[in-house]
Amino acid sequence: ISSIKTNNKIINVVASIYAKENGLNNCVLLNKEKMVAEFINSNIFIIKNDQIFTPTIKSGCLNGVLRKNLINILKKSSYSISETDISTFDLTQSDEVFGTNVIQGLFCVTNYRNKIYSNNQSQQIIKLLNNNLS
């Protein structure tokens, strides 16, 4: 996975087909180190113990416009945000997970594998984002 936006979206296309064939709304894309890079069509953020984490650009995630804006907004707020490596185990241990892209904005993830997430903090972050972008 590359952080450079290109016309080569074969991984995303194959992942989208896999998701559709298996009744999934989305898939988590992993890099060659088997660390989380992003969702099929969006950046990924996790919340654990009131701290927000998102994969580093080195993970292969796209440095999306909304991702950059949200990180800047969160850094200026009372939230703690860190760019770090995220494993699939981290996803199962998170309190909340959300994604961002310019089409959907910020959306809450309801579940991953057998883990069901709340979305209380994610909803507050949506309000913060909307207030800062309007």
Predicted regions and their residues:
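Helix-start/capping segments and mature chain N-termini
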Residues: 1-134
